[in-house]
UniProtKB/Swiss-Prot annotation:
GO cellular component: cytoplasm; nucleolus; nucleus; ribonucleoprotein complex
Region (Disordered), start-end ranges: 358-394
Name of protein: Proliferation-associated protein 2G4
PTM-bearing positions, type Phosphothreonine: T366, T386
Assembly behavior: Isoform 2 interacts with the cytoplasmic domain of non-phosphorylated ERBB3; the interaction requires PKC activity. Interacts with AR. Treatment with HRG leads to dissociation from ERBB3 and increases association with AR. Interacts with nucleolin/NCL. Component of a ribonucleoprotein complex containing at least PA2G4, NCL, TOP1, PABPC2, RPLP0, acetylated histone H1 (HIST1H1A or H1F1), histone H1 2/4, RPL4, RPL8, RPL15, RPL18, RPL18A, RPL21, RPL11, RPL12, RPL28, RPL27, RPLP2 and RPL24. Interacts with HDAC2. Interacts with RB1; the interaction is enhanced upon PA2G4 dephosphorylation.
Region (RNA-binding): 46-54
The UniProt record lists the keyword Cell membrane: no
Cross-link (Glycyl lysine isopeptide (Lys-Gly) (interchain with G-Cter in SUMO2)): K298
Length: 394
């Protein structure tokens, strides 16, 4: 099957492909909102991750029912990373759970695919902000910085622009809030069945990464998952020894697995997930999955998504959206329920050029979106408001 796919790559030049992306985006947005609503003090992260994944499977099960062969479901397992945890925290039943508490800064990250067309989204918020009160201090700084980085990217990721322009804007926005983008993190181009396409945008690269990172120009009919991670600290993410639970198959690697458990595990991975990221939680026998993954990862048949941490006491905020580069402007298909008025920072973007960029109209795109998709008028309206408020407030 994959041979044919490679010859005939389907892009958003086809209406049906756009429809599949938008259906995945709608589901991702709905699941995200329902998880944000369910997040409160005393709630377990494991239970929320399970709820998110179950909801993605349930919702994708309701569409394209007649197409029995079509694969659809989770494109990135629900991960909920709190405070200084940067990303990929998605515990197994056998791992230590985390219970949310008042004041926690929470990042929810998930992805949905319909026929291999991927819609990723991530959102940050704070637990238990009372009606009429505001989040202040470093949490507010880092959330505002990350959100404005995402808004800048929405205006910069368009045909003719370079990936380096986005990287530079992110550094400037983050620094104006005395924050730092997480070093070396990548946003990827998306293609059918491919979550890590070749064109990327790098955050806060080291000198070496700057040299090595491919410069690229955005082109019409491309799709990107734009992923912003900003820290109140130095922006260095480290593996703190937490068990990795999310992996994806690397189709370019081959190896003859020796252990029976590993072989059984790997063939289930191929059958159920193809090259999409998956969680070990999705296996009926978690213990066997934990054993089977070891040999597969050791020989690089599977790539790990390690759980990363910033220094204790710092905060990391994340916003991720998926954008289709349509001929009439970028179309954002995923976003979270961001409420700018909840976050009060003493700092703001000073750079005149950036200010102008952030205030530049995203409503033109919204209008074009409205023509494209009447069904999402409500969401366009909300994203439109956020953009206008941003323009006015910053």
């Amino acid at each position: 099957m994959s041979g044919e796919d490679e010859q005939q790559e389907q892009t958003i030049a086809e209406d049906l492909v756009v429809t599949k992306y938008k259906m995945g985006g709608d589901i991702a947005n709905r699941v995200l909102r329902s998880l944000v609503e369910a997040s409160s003090s005393g709630v377990s992260v494991l239970s929320l991750c399970e709820k998110g994944d179950a909801m993605i499977m349930e919702e994708t099960g309701k569409i394209f029912k007649k197409e029995k062969e079509m694969k659809k479901g989770i494109a990135f397992p629900t991960s909920i990373s709190v405070n200084n945890c940067v990303c990929h925290f998605s515990p197994l039943k056998s791992d230590q759970d985390y219970i949310l508490k008042e004041g926690d800064l929470v990042k929810i990250d998930l992805g949905v695919h319909v026929d291999g067309f991927i819609a990723n989204v991530a959102h940050t918020f704070v637990i238990g902000v009372a009606q009429g009160s505001q989040v202040t201090g470093r949490k507010a700084d880092v959330i505002k910085a990350a959100h404005l980085c995402a808004e800048a990217a929405l205006r910069l990721v368009k045909p003719g622009n370079q990936n380096t322009q986005v990287t530079e804007a992110w550094n400037k926005v983050a620094h104006s809030f005395n924050c730092t983008p997480i070093e070396g993190m990548l946003s990827h181009q998306l293609k059918q069945h491919v979550i890590d396409g070749e064109k990327t945008i790098i955050q806060n690269p080291t000198d070496q990464q700057k040299k090595d990172h491919e410069k690229a120009e955005f082109e019409v009919h491309e799709v990107y998952a734009v992923d912003v991670l900003v820290s109140s600290g130095e922006g260095k993410a480290k593996d703190a020894g937490q068990r990795t639970t999310i992996y994806k198959r690397d189709p370019s690697k081959q190896y003859g697995l020796k252990m029976k458990t590993s072989r059984a595990f790997f063939s289930e991975v191929e059958r159920r997930f193809d090259a999409m990221p998956f969680t070990l939680r999705a296996f009926e026998d978690e213990k066997k999955a934990r054993m089977g993954v070891v040999e597969c990862a050791k020989h690089e048949l599977l790539q790990p998504f390690n759980v990363l941490y910033e220094k204790e006491g710092e905060f990391v905020a994340q916003f991720k959206f998926t954008v289709l580069l349509m001929p009439n402007g970028p179309m954002r298909i995923t976003s979270g329920p961001f409420e700018p008025d909840l976050y009060k920072s003493e700092m703001e973007v000073q750079d005149a050029e950036l200010k102008a960029l952030l205030q530049s109209s995203a409503s033109r795109k919204t209008q074009k979106k409205k023509k494209k998709k009447a069904s999402k008028t409500a969401e366009n309206a909300t994203s439109g408001e956020t953009l206008e408020e941003n323009g006015a407030g910053d």
